[in-house]
């Protein structure tokens, strides 16, 4: 059985604005999603929500990953099991982690030869397919780890300090949030577009502080 894991992610700066081309800074977290795969007579997806075949309702990201890999190599059967430490709907990029881990495991099992860049790109395509719109931040950070700027994909120095993440326990759908922001932008472009630009500028202002370790300034910008 082949195994692959990928980390979740938080936005330190630039959330939502990055969908519209503005700069964001994403950071990988220690919580991970692990996917194990092996050959099987049919396609079986096993997770905490149950067992299915290709199912775009219950397992949309995994199903899309399998379909993408099937465009490269024929897949008659595969057993794919997911174990995740990342709370779903918590803003920690659980969907990106399961997508990247699934692509990575299938890539190894079927010898597709995909590079990390190609895995990240495929993961982003899947998130766009499932969510309607998505930034490449989640899948890129989940693939490469560390602290990364998007869209220019520059690695920043990882902060030598702890970051506290609070889990409210309240579920929120990324797809719904992205859709709501898009509708708001379409209804009030004169208000929302300048806000997106300012959010991007805050991200750019924060970049050099990661390199110098100026955590006080990073905190103030947050």
Question: For the regions a protein language model found, what residue spans apply to each?
Answer:
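C-terminal nucleotide
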Residues: 1-7, 11, 18, 34-74, ...
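Short, histidine-centered active-site or binding-site loop motifs used for metal coordination
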Residues: 16, 49, 84-86
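Short, solvent-exposed loop/turn segments at secondary-structure junctions
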Residues: 19-21, 89
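Short Gly/Pro-enriched turn/cap motifs at secondary-structure boundaries
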Residues: 24-28
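DPxDG-like acidic metal-binding loop motif
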Residues: 29-31, 92-114
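Short pre-catalytic strand/loop immediately N-terminal to key active-site residues, enriched for Gly-Thr
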Residues: 78-90
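Active-site nucleophile and cofactor-binding loops and adjacent substrate-binding regions
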Residues: 93-94, 135, 141
């Amino acid at each position: 059985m082949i195994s692959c894991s990928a980390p979740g992610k938080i936005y330190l700066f630039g959330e939502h604005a990055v969908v519209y081309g503005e700069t964001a800074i994403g950071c990988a977290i220690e919580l991970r999603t692990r996917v194990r795969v092996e050959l099987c007579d049919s396609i079986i997806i096993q997770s905490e929500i149950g067992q299915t075949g290709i199912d775009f309702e219950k397992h949309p990201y995994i199903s899309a990953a399998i379909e993408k890999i099937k465009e490269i190599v024929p897949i008659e059967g595969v057993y794919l099991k997911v174990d995740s430490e990342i709370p779903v709907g918590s803003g920690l990029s659980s969907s990106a982690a399961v997508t990247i881990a699934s692509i990575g495991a299938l890539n190894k099992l079927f010898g597709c030869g995909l590079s990390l860049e190609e895995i990240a790109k495929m993961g982003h395509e899947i998130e766009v397919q499932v969510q309607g719109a998505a930034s490449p931040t989640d899948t890129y950070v989940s693939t490469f780890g560390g602290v990364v700027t998007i869209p220019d994909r520059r690695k920043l120095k990882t902060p030598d300090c702890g970051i506290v993440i609070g889990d409210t326990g309240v579920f929120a759908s990324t797809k719904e949030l992205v859709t709501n922001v898009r509708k708001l932008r379409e209804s009030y472009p004169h208000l929302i577009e300048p806000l997106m630009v300012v959010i991007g500028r805050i991200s750019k202002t924060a970049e050099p502080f990661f390199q110098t370790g100026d955590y006080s300034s990073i905190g103030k910008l947050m």
